[in-house]
Design a protein with these regions (language model features):
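Catalytic core of membrane glycerolipid acyltransferases/transacylases, capturing the structured
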Residues: 1-11, 18, 72
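Non-catalytic C-terminal accessory region of glycerolipid acyltransferases
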Residues: 14-131
Length: 131
C-alpha cells in the first residue's frame, strides 16, 4: 500500500502526477474528498473538487464508498459501495471550475444516498428478533 501525501495549504501538481502514475498502473487510489476525517455524522462537510479533477484528467471512474463511523473500536466496520460514476458523461468540452464544483456536489449527494441506504439496511437488521 502506498500513501500520497497532500499538503492542503500548499497543493502542487506533483500530487496529480503521483495519482496519475498509480492509476496508469491499474492501482486503486482512495481519496477522501472532504479533505479531512469527517467528524460529522450527518455528512455536512463539503467535498473539494480535486478528486473530480484527478478523475477527469486520468479518465477513470469514481466509485463512491460510504464508510459508517464506528462508535467503538470493536464494532464491525459497515460500508456500502456505489456504482462507478463516469464524470465525463456529465460535462461537455473542457471542464470549467463550476463544472468541477457541481460534480463534487453530485458526489457528496451520492455519499448521502449511500449513507441513507446503509442506515435503512441496518435498521431492518436491528428489528429482527433472534432466539
Amino acid at each position: 500500500m502506498q500513501c500520497i501525501p497532500v499538503n492542503k495549504q500548499n497543493f502542487n501538481y506533483s500530487t496529480f502526477k503521483q495519482v496519475e502514475y498509480w492509476l496508469d498502473r491499474n492501482s486503486i487510489v482512495a481519496i477522501f474528498p472532504e479533505g479531512t476525517v469527517n467528524e460529522n455524522k450527518d455528512l455536512t462537510n463539503t467535498f473539494h473538487s480535486g478528486a473530480v479533477l484527478m478523475a477527469l484528467k486520468c479518465k477513470v471512474p469514481i466509485i463512491p464508498i460510504y464508510i459508517k463511523r464506528r462508535e467503538h473500536w470493536y464494532e464491525r466496520l459497515r460500508y456500502v459501495i456505489g456504482e462507478p460514476i463516469y464524470l465525463r458523461d456529465y460535462i461537455k468540452g473542457v471542464p470549467k471550475i463550476d463544472d468541477l464544483i457541481s460534480l463534487a456536489d453530485m458526489l457528496h449527494d451520492k455519499e448521502v444516498e449511500l449513507k441513507a441506504f446503509l442506515d435503512r439496511k441496518l435498521q431492518k437488521k436491528e428489528k429482527k428478533i433472534y432466539f
